[in-house]
Amino acid sequence: MKPLHYTASALALGLALMGNAQAVTTIPFWHSMEGELGKEVDSLAQRFNAENPDYKIVPTYKGNYEQNLSAGIAVFRTGNAPAILQVYEVGTATMMASKAIKPVYDVFKEAGIQFDESQFVPTVSGYYSDSKTGHLLSQPFNSSTSVLYYNKDAFKKAGLDPEQPPKTWQDLADYSAKLKASGIKCGYASGWQGWIQLENFSAWNGLPFASKNNGFDGTDAVLEFNKPEQVKHIAMLEEMNKKGDFSYVGRKDESTEKFYNGDCAMTTASSGSLANIREYAKFNYGVGMMPYDADAKDAPQNAIIGGASLWVMQGKDKETYTGVAKFLDFLAKPENAAEWHQKTGYLPITKAAYDLTREQGFYEKNPGADTATRQMLNKPPLPFTKGLRLGNMPQIRVIVDEELESVWTGKKTPQQALDTAVERGNQLLRRFEKSTKS
């Protein structure tokens, strides 16, 4: 028989280990990052968990942005919401009005962790800040903007300069026709058509998308993207479509795959698509700025962000919120934010991450990697080009998709389609306005 004191010591050690295991606070994190992006999310969580053994971030892919938002709100009503929910930028007004969230500045304050809100790039943080207090409601994470990807090898074959992507939409139409004539299957395709062809087109060309400074100044905003400039742009795409120089391939990021598999020579897509393009493209490619309308006065202006931020959900205990604050602080550290930016193509969300990336020589070694950032900082944003804050915006995007599809199929003129989209969208805005006052 073993001596009693050894047995007692072993028992005490075992109980201590069990206690430590039980003390680990699990923090569910629902997101919409798949493929290479999902792998990087997992990597960040694993590193945080290794450095903070009292907490365990559990990332779970819950489908695309719409699916994740719907799932998060639905389970909140049952009391089973995740601690952290990734929500795309147009879900901001919905989250603000949901009463399901705990503002991140409160989370940090209650956890006793210093939180410097000024560290975030203003054009990014402004999208997620309270209009009255200026405090962040959610933490920027995978912020992006739309950029132009182009196949340099296809450019050479078509007799185009592979180092000179089209600067204007008029140039793009001309380039696409030449690419098609050279034998490529698809000259140009676009991802996220509402976000790129109307939301970002408007901001990049110095045009409002909606009144009340795109909704930042009140829920009584009305949509304004059926003006002559936007109608002219959609009409140009319609004409390209008729000629076969513009291919409509889907409502989301389907054009990215069409690009990296070599079908399409050019696409406008999220800067966050760079990770998959870098992984799968078997040809030389370039990253250019979004084209602007050659007839637009003072264009280009500034791009607005897409992507998503991290929202903290209500109803959790103090220890969970402390772990959440530690994780969000971890994500914002320069070395982690810079790595996320460099590996994914999403914007550097903090000034320090941008400076570190530049100091490391990343932009020199990877031409075009700073394109999205330069677009965001091209000019100081106007009151109506800093972003959108419109209720029911996810549903409005669906309406825009439906109406643009009616143009590509020849069922409506650009003016008819945009007028109808504005009319239908305004009905949703009034419904949202009413709900916030009830």
Curated annotation (Swiss-Prot):
Keyword Cell inner membrane: no
Subcellular location: Periplasm
Gene3D superfamilies from the UniProt entry: Periplasmic binding protein-like II (3.40.190.10)
Signal sequence, start to end: 1-23
SUPFAM superfamilies given in the database record: Periplasmic binding protein-like II (SSF53850)
CDD domains in the record: PBP2_UgpB
GO biological process: transmembrane transport
GO (cellular component) term, any one: outer membrane-bounded periplasmic space
Positions bound to sn-glycerol 3-phosphate: Y65, E89, S144, S270, G307, Y346, R397
Keyword line: Periplasm, Signal, Transport
Pfam family of the protein (one): SBP_bac_8
Role: Part of the ABC transporter complex UgpBAEC involved in sn-glycerol-3-phosphate (G3P) import. Binds G3P.
Subunit: The complex is composed of two ATP-binding proteins (UgpC), two transmembrane proteins (UgpA and UgpE) and a solute-binding protein (UgpB).
Family: Belongs to the bacterial solute-binding protein 1 family.
Name of the protein this chain belongs to: sn-glycerol-3-phosphate-binding periplasmic protein UgpB
Organism: Shigella flexneri
Gene this protein is translated from: ugpB
